[in-house]
């Protein structure tokens, strides 16, 4: 005969005091991030939580664009999550990057396509990968730099999205160097004009309103 179910009263069931808040924060994070595979994302979430690492969580819900309604495409929000997780080091190991990529439920094929733009061995400078990721969100240098500024800025959302000129110039020069049709002298002249602009304001910063470029980078 099967044993009868054991009945417990409320006083006998011990609920860890931190459990409700953990589940509450997890639920909020899942709603904001909208992972394509909740189980896979959850594994990455609790693994990062247990180690005290930055969590794979978006700052806010992103509205899907036309190409993202039926796939797991890369977005600015997901790139920002990766930036929080990887930017503490100058270089990121490709194996670690791939693990974090998978935890965000992004297709590995997309990662490999991005890395093919500037092949490397075992690691890549993080700011360069971020630049490549931003370039994959839009086919123009203007769009890439816009995404770079919005991810790196300390300004509030919807603000001027300013970043240091040195950072802007480094990323711009890197991406423009991947375009064989963009003369180096044109890049240098453009960056010189922006540098003079930032120096005239005495803040050394460049924001979205300071640039507009419409050339393809790949």
From Swiss-Prot:
It comes from Mus musculus. Gene3D superfamilies: cAMP-dependent protein kinase regulatory subunit, dimerization-anchoring domain. Belongs to the ropporin family. It is found in: Cell projection, Cilium, Flagellum; Cell projection, Cilium. GO terms for molecular function: identical protein binding. It comes from the Eukaryota. This is Ropporin-1-like protein. SUPFAM superfamilies: Dimerization-anchoring domain of cAMP-dependent PK regulatory subunit. CDD domains: DD_ROP (cd23019). Component of the axonemal radial spoke complex 1 (RS1), at least composed of spoke head proteins RSPH1, RSPH3, RSPH9 and the cilia-specific component RSPH4A or sperm-specific component RSPH6A, spoke stalk proteins RSPH14, DNAJB13, DYDC1, ROPN1L and NME5, and the anchor protein IQUB. May interact with AKAP3. Interacts with FSCB; the interaction increases upon spermatozoa capacitation conditions. Interacts with CFAP61. The keyword Ubl conjugation applies. Residues 17-54 form the RIIa domain. Keywords: Cell projection, Cilium, Flagellum, Ubl conjugation. Functions as part of axonemal radial spoke complexes that play an important part in the motility of sperm and cilia. Important for male fertility. With ROPN1, involved in fibrous sheath integrity and sperm motility, plays a role in PKA-dependent signaling processes required for spermatozoa capacitation. The keyword Ubl conjugation applies. Testis-specific. Expression is restricted to germ cells. One of its GO terms (biological process) is cilium movement. Sumoylated, sumoylation decreases upon spermatozoa capacitation conditions. InterPro entries: ROP_DD (IPR047844). Disruption phenotype: Mutant mice have normal testicular morphology and spermatogenesis but have moderately impaired motility and increased levels of ROPN1. Double knockout animals for ROPN1 and ROPN1L are infertile with normal testicular morphology and spermatogenesis but defects in sperm morphology, thinning and shredding of the principal piece. Sperm is immotile. GO terms for cellular component: 9+2 motile cilium; extracellular region; motile cilium; nucleoplasm; radial spoke; sperm flagellum. Its main location: other.
């Amino acid at each position: 005969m099967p044993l009868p179910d054991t009945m417990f009263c409320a006083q006998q069931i011990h609920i860890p005091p931190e459990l409700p808040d953990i589940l509450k924060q997890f639920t909020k994070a899942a709603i904001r991030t909208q992972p394509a595979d909740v189980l896979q994302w959850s594994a990455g979430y609790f693994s990062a939580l247990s180690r005290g690492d930055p969590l794979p969580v978006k700052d806010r819900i992103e509205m899907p664009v036309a190409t993202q309604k039926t796939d797991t495409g890369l977005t600015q929000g997901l790139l920002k999550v990766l930036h929080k997780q990887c930017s503490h080091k100058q270089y990121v190991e490709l194996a670690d990057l791939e693990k974090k990529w998978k935890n965000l439920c992004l297709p590995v094929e997309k990662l490999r396509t991005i890395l093919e733009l500037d092949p490397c061995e075992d690691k890549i400078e993080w700011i360069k990968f971020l630049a490549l990721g931003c370039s994959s969100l839009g086919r123009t240098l203007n769009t890439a730099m816009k995404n770079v500024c919005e991810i790196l800025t300390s300004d509030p959302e919807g603000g001027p999205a300013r970043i240091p000129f040195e950072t802007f110039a480094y990323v711009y020069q890197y991406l423009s160097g991947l375009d064989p049709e963009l003369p180096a002298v044109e890049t240098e002249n453009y960056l010189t004009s922006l540098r003079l602009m930032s120096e005239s304001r005495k803040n050394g910063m460049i924001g979205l309103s300071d640039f507009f470029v419409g050339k393809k980078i790949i």
